[in-house]
Amino acid sequence: MKTNPIHKEIKANLARSGMTLTEVVSKMNMNRAADNQTTIQNISNKIIRGTIKYSEILEIASILNMNIVWKDTRKEEIQNV
């Protein structure tokens, strides 16, 4: 099975932060209502399949003390011409 870019990026950022996905999911559940809890298996499957919600990615980034940056690539195209 081909690894999707989201999977690679989340794995790399977990490694950079020194946290495991288990620790991240535990922190996710601390901030969620009891009826909205998730599991390591659920999040892992979503990451692998590429079906994870953007809101969950933002939640993971926040736990890792990271920001997601949207960069205007049109400016790069103009500068590289």
Task: Indicate residue ranges for each PLM-predicted region.
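Short secondary-structure boundary/hinge segments and terminal tails
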Residues: 27, 32, 77-81
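Short, charged recognition helix plus adjacent turn
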Residues: 12, 37, 62, 69-81
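Residue-level signal for the short linker/turn that defines the boundary of a DNA-recognition helix
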Residues: 5-8, 19, 38, 51-55
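DNA major-groove recognition helix of helix-turn-helix/homeodomain DNA-binding modules
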Residues: 53-69
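Recognition helix of helix-turn-helix/homeodomain-like DNA-binding domains
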Residues: 29-51
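A short, Lys/Arg-rich alpha-helix, primarily the initiator
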Residues: 1-23, 27
